[in-house]
Amino acid sequence: MKKMKKYDAIIIGFGKGGKTLAGFLAGKGQNVALVEKSDKMYGGTCINIGCIPTKKLVDSTKVLKNKGLSGIEEKERFYTESINNKNKLIGALRGKNYEMLATKENIDIYDGFGSFASKNVVNIESNGENVQIEGEKIFINTGSTTIIPGIKGLKESNHVYTSTSIMELKELPKKLTILGAGYIGLEFASMYADFGSEVTVIDLAKRLMPREDEEIADRA
């Protein structure tokens, strides 16, 4: 039986916190294992599904305005190009984040789903196979998942997207309804309206950006 590999630290999650901590501990001479279940999430939310891709698309809408495109077919083609350009950008950044740690001798990166087998042992499941590693210290940097509201039929629909999945949609939606008038919902509403979608925003609150100060919300 293959001997279980031991580490000074195991970090579950290759996000902003995980990658920074891994680099810091490795710099102190510790042997580090970094576990990530998705090869699309090296570097975390900001790089892959948050700040950078959304701002790249927002910037694309400014280019669209400057080009003066008005026809729906022109806008649809431009939107598809914008999604492809966004994917190229985050792919490059994701690769840089991976190489930044993968090239360090005392960091091992495991692709797979990490779970606790015991207090100091992590089981990593990948492609039907399991590997177990042991760590003196274990850090959890798993982030969060999207919550789908409990509206009847919503989870079963093929036309429901999250803020993550809609940015993979290569065909511009003609009509788009956004549930939630917070800053994320409004960013997507503004962005897709600029691309050419007909957008409706729905929220239980009486005003936009209900979690923000009224002075800020009034400027939305």
Per-range role (PLM):
Residues 3-15, 172-182:
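Beta1/beta-strand and adjacent pyrophosphate-binding region of the FAD-binding site
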Residues 4-7, 24-30, 36-172, 205-209, ...:
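Glycine-rich flavin
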Residues 8-34, 185-194:
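N-terminal Rossmann-like FAD-binding beta1-loop-alpha1 element of flavoenzymes
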Residues 12, 35, 141, 178-179, ...:
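Hydrophobic residues in beta-strands of the RecA-like P-loop NTPase core, especially within AAA+ ATPase
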Residues 13, 89-90, 180, 212:
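Residues that cap or flank secondary-structure elements
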Residues 170-208, 212:
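Rossmann-like NAD(P)H-binding beta-loop-alpha module
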